[in-house]
Amino acid sequence: MKQSNNEPQRRPLNRREFMAAASAAAISLAVEGVAQTGGSGPRKVFLVPNFHPASCGWLTTFSRERVYCANSYLDHLDRVRDDPHYAFVLSEVNNIIAIMNFQPERIPELKQRVAEKRVELVNAYFLESTINLSGGEALVRLGVEGLRWYEQVFGLRPKYSWNIDVCGTHDQMPQIASGLGLEALIYTRRNPTGKTIYWSVSPDGSKILTLSPGGYSEAGAIFSSKTLLDGDALSKLAKFFDSKESITPEGAPILVLAGGDDYALAPTVKSYPSEFLEQWGKGASGRKIEFATLSQYVDAIQPEIAAGKIALPTLNGGTAYDFDAFWIECAEVKTRYRRNEHALQAAEMLATIASLRATESSFDYPAQALHDAWILMCLNMDRNTLWGSAGGMVFVSEQSWDAQDRFDWVKKTTEQTLDSAGKSLLPAGTEIGLFNPLNWKRKDPIELQLPAGTSLEGLPSELLPNGSILCQPEMLSISTCGLKLAHRPASTPEVVDLPEVIETRYYLAHFDRATGALTSLKSKKTSRELLGAPANVIVAEQPTKVQDNAPADFMPPRPERTRVASSSDQPSTMRAARGPVAWTIEASGTFYGGGAIHRRVRLYHDSPRIDFETELNDVPNHTVVVAEFPLALDIAQVRRGIPFGFSHGAWATPDAQLHGWTKGIVPVVRWSDYAFSGGGGFAILDRGLSGREVNGRTPILYLINAQDEYHGYPNGWLSGKGRHVLPYSVVSYDGGWSEARIPQMAWEYNREPVVIPGRGATQAQSFVETSDNVIVEAMRREGNHIELRLVECRGLPGNATIKVLFPHQNAMLTDLVGRRLFNVRPAATYRLPVRAQQIVTMHLETSTSVPILPATTSWESFVPAEKVAALHAYDPELKGHPPFGNGATF
């Protein structure tokens, strides 16, 4: 219709006005018919922008990754400067160190924005780690070191367990996070409750507010669009917010962790978020949006929760897992980490004792070196590093500081500390000293490196092919001793014909002479058969369906894979040898792909542990290899080690009182256990082979997920090429699980006594003794006290005793960061009530102090000289997502 002259003349809309009008109409249409919450209209949305990298390297080196991270966070900081409506959260100490190193002039600005509450230092931990693969003490140190760093550098303590990229959350996280004094636990995957806010509860009863709102980088159109959002895009955004209504507890606003996918930058449209909010405000939805920090959201819900106006569900136990390839691959990084963390904990213990009880020479507690070692272990807990899921340049690089460098630095530090501390405690001589870092009397089989041609006086011992000595010395709890050497070699095991039955104090075992499989294992005590089919059969498998996703990230469970070969397909050459300590059975043959396979099984005359070592060579690409142990009896319950405890779930028959997750591929720390319906059970121990799965009566241990490349980059540690030596162990028991001492046996398998050469023969001396229901994970010096940390290990409430046999004054129980809970009267023996899997921290005052250490703000002192140039290389244009590879070496 032609416009009437009487109608007012309207000027044409410019583009932004047109977009705003269209947006308003779209939002209005989108909310028609949407249910109103409590009759008050749609709930407010808190958008929390964040940047999510793999800060120690994923698709590039450590040195280059930190440039990406620094520049990307500065991109967010620029938007805070330029737009009064923008806010974001910043995570990981090493990212701030990168900003300090490359653009130190921006640090005052960052501190200003933190004070203005437009930037929040959100993560209490030193970095965003995988929480499922380290020991408990390493995970706690990650939090302690992070909190101390922020307090020293920024004068504040972050309030959150920011775990947005973990791939499953274990049962002890509520206790660890609350023990660190944190207000809430945040993760995004495998939320089983159906609500975005709930209480998470650990086995000891500790609970923490938990936020699991969806993905960690949602509402992506706001950030990734190159133009103002049009009506259709805004309509989709409105529907996305609507979808959050049903999963957000009634009465609570909506939380969205916002960004444009991994490595998210500030919105590409420079006028966002202000212009976006203007667009949104002209719509008719009535839904308010605020770009906020996490604390602004938590501050909004906490009073309402406390007043009972927001009802929350409760989750006991952990969650399911995903990205399951992470638990089964790159044994090199996982075993190195395990070895180093146990060595570091032992070094702290012996150094503590030596600094207080040295008799041969004075010993100063090496506080700086041990602190530095923990900082480097924190870096190697970075998610993609410890998962083993990254380009090879993250692990070994000729140009850049890498994970191997950090492992080597920690190894050197712990060896030097153990040697010097041990020598200050024990008199010089021509014998050897031993230090047992475990808090119980032990007599497990161990391998010792002794001077050539010697053995231990008065103790059965046998010579191993690698030149070490196999023996079983008895040692007291957390003790030192000096043992006399016999100047004659240990016995060489006698090669014999493989007997029909191998008999030890604990087992009757039979091996297949053709395949090398363990075909029968009977309890000596009950004559009960433990195996339902040949065991320690090594099986090669591949996914049944062609995978679209990267197999170094995703791996289906065993029922969705095809068996392509096994160690029983080809004949094996068998060898049996009997020594004074053990039977050793070896089977050699050819495996899938044509590579050699060597299996060694060691059955000890006087130990229930059976040790295995499987060597694989040149495993073909895209192949999963497992060791299977089919059992003869139904499995009633499954337990598996997690940081500072264990997960406990039902198997054959559901049990609502057991909350542990048991299905599919799961991560394990040190041990998994399968309790039989009729009593007794079977456990698998590991030194870093962290993947387990059980189907029916058959547990499997994952050995290799062979992938030559990771997203286009070669990775020698992930590849099946070359030689792979993979140790593991099993043990069975006839009685109840709480008496079987499986956690203690797993610690023994992972931490042999420390050898101190060139010492005199001395009586054994114990320094800490405890009841058998706790495991001491840490003993170190800090300031004017000794920190002693232990955990109840049976899963049962009771009483613990701790006898401390070195001088100290006042004592108190603290939380994980050393804040006093209550004083304890000083005594030689402490008796404490403990809850199931409770973590207990004691501080024992000393008459002398060790220095309080400054915060780490540079990596140069740790980096090999030839790699310092790469550490300092800076390119201001690098930000956002590093590129994927093309099959070439980085």
Place the predicted regions along the sequence by residue.
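CE4/NodB-like, metal-dependent polysaccharide N-deacetylase domain
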Residues: L139-Q172, I176-G179, K236-A258
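N-terminal secretory signal peptides and thylakoid transit peptides that target proteins
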Residues: S4-A25
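C-terminal (or distal) subdomains of carbohydrate-active enzymes
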Residues: M173-I176, S212, S224-A233, F241, ...
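Alpha-helical scaffolding within the catalytic cores
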Residues: D75, F102-R113, P192-S200, D230-K244
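Acidic, His- and aromatic-enriched active-site or binding-groove loops in soluble protein domains
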Residues: I107-L121, S178-T193, P203-S206
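Boundary at the C-terminal end of the N-terminal hydrophobic targeting segment
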Residues: G33-T37
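Catalytic grooves of carbohydrate-active enzymes
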Residues: L47, H52-W58, Q152, I208, ...
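N-terminal catalytic cores of secreted or lumenal carbohydrate-active enzymes
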Residues: G38-R141, Y150
